[in-house]
Amino acid sequence: MRFLQFVAMVLTGLALVPFGAHLFALPNKIHLSESDYLIAQNIYRGWALLGIVLIGAALANFALTILVRGQRVPFVFNLVSLLCLLATLAIFFAFTFPANQATNNWTEMPANWQQLRWQWEISHATNAVIIFVAFCSLTVSLLLTQE
């Protein structure tokens, strides 16, 4: 179980990194002009692969939740972590992914680009907060788990 706890912690922590970067960049990006925003968005080329980390974190947290189901408090905290990770996936596919599709991954700027920018930025910021809660909840679960 210790190895799985380690994997869950590492993957959940790594999943927080890109969303945290988006959260902290938001104040600097939200008011950029169309051309400057398009340039800034090019920074994220290839970041889609980081979705693998998020899915891995969710799977590791799922397995860990099953393993600690006999320990009420660690189970609840681990379940919260798992549900938070699943919520980030739901938010991504409900808000971020459609904005990426509408802008061809920010290589084209449609007429409603400002609304799409807001949708994209806020969905990432929201996910940063949710993954932080997942990370904290997982940490509490790990601290309270009996071997």
Residues covered by each model-derived region:
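Interfacial segments of alpha-helical transmembrane regions
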Residues: 1-15, 63, 67-87
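Interfacial loop at the N-terminal end of multi-pass membrane proteins
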Residues: 2-59, 100, 104-117
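Hydrophobic alpha-helical membrane-associated segments
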Residues: 14-21, 87-91, 95
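Core segments of alpha-helical transmembrane spans in multipass integral membrane proteins
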Residues: 27, 41-65, 85-93, 122, ...
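Structural signal for the C-terminal ends of transmembrane alpha-helices
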Residues: 66-70, 140-146
